[in-house]
A protein has these predicted regions:
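Alpha-helical, largely C-terminal catalytic domains
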Residues: 1-349
């Protein structure tokens, strides 16, 4: 295994978390309880073979994947929100496999074996063989295929290939101990699954916006801003998890190691970016709503859903044990002193 960098801050770290000013309200899909129940069964029956042991499976069962799906896609059709939860669990698992420094996150050769197994499922070349990684990806794709138009499915598979390609770049960079500049880092991580997820949101609503995305630069820019929001929010809350794994592929680490910021300054910069990206999205959304394409009911509904995705991802990030540690139950504190340890995030208030 390649060496990872020594911890730059020690084994118990404190900082002040500013309250993040929010513009867009939070909304949750009314079928959350059902989605959670069915997603638990899905993880057990379809993904269990991907995990290294039972403890890892249990952790994924408690990470609130279905809640994330229901918060970022609250207006999905009832029969599709469950598939959105399945998507979340499946691809969050692949993200763990490829990003965890204790798994394959610093082992390019082994990671490439997984990627080579998955790619035929994304290229229309799957012959029904392959290992467990291909089967899980293939089955997840096939669940949505009957409800997607051919052009939407083609775009979705392209999104997933971009996701996989970004994994490859990240594993190699992590193994070399390289820390990219902020723009390179942001571009790489926006590519890592963000557009694939937004296509799933679009699918959840029952829309196919392929043509609109091809012709409207503004709509593409709005979706890009959602992807940027995902990255900056996730990096704030996932810093604990990644730092204690020895993974410096995180915005806070980029600001500290490449820009020379202290931890508190890096946290405040990231919180400022979270607010800035949301403001930019709201402005872009208003611009589109005032244009010809913004008169379309499907475009208007999708723009509304993209806003909920921004708000929902932030809300979920306070709550999930995925970032905050096993057994985490959020106490409602949004600002104040925070302590991070290898086991958990503690919100002191």
């Amino acid at each position: 295994m390649a060496e990872v960098r020594p911890k730059m801050l020690g084994d118990e770290v404190e900082f002040y978390l500013p309250e993040i000013k929010r513009i867009i309200p939070v909304k949750c899909h009314p079928q959350y309880a059902r989605a959670e129940e069915l997603n638990t069964r899905y993880i057990r029956s379809e993904l269990r073979g991907l995990y290294r042991d039972e403890a890892e499976c249990q952790r994924n069962l408690t990470d609130l994947h279905a809640l994330w799906a229901c918060l970022v896609n609250p207006n999905a059709k009832d029969e599709r929100i469950v598939k959105g939860a399945y998507w979340t669990s499946c691809w969050f698992t692949y993200d763990d496999i490829m990003s965890d420094a204790g798994w394959l996150g610093v082992m390019p050769a082994q990671a490439q074996e997984v990627i080579d197994d998955v790619l035929p499922a994304l290229n229309g070349e799957d012959d029904g063989t392959g290992k467990k990684y291909r089967k899980a990806a293939r089955d997840n794709i096939l669940m949505m295929q009957p409800d997607m138009t051919p052009r939407q499915m083609k775009r979705y598979l392209r999104n997933l290939r971009e996701y996989i390609d970004a994994f490859t770049d990240e594993v190699v960079m992590r193994a070399r101990g390289e820390i990219p500049d902020w723009k390179t880092y942001l571009d790489m991580h926006v590519t890592s699954g963000c557009e694939a997820n937004l296509t799933v949101l679009e699918y959840g609503q029952g829309f196919d916006l392929t043509e609109e995305l091809e012709t409207s630069k503004e709509l593409r820019e709005a979706r890009r801003l959602v992807g940027e929001s995902y990255v900056v929010v996730n990096d704030l809350f996932s810093f604990r998890k990644e730092y204690f794994q020895g993974d410096y592929g995180n915005a806070i680490s980029v600001f500290m190691l490449n820009e020379g910021l202290q931890l508190q300054d890096a946290v405040e910069k990231l919180c400022g970016l979270i607010e800035e990206v949301e403001r930019k999205f709201v402005e872009k959304r208003e611009e589109i709503l005032g244009s010809n394409i913004g008169t379309r009911p499907d475009v208007r509904a999708h723009l509304s859903e993209l806003g909920y995705a921004i708000a929902g991802n932030l809300e979920w990030s306070y709550r999930t044990p995925r970032y905050n540690g096993a057994g985490h139950v959020w106490n409602g504190v949004r600002s104040g002193k925070v302590t991070i340890t290898p086991e958990r995030t503690i919100y002191h208030g």
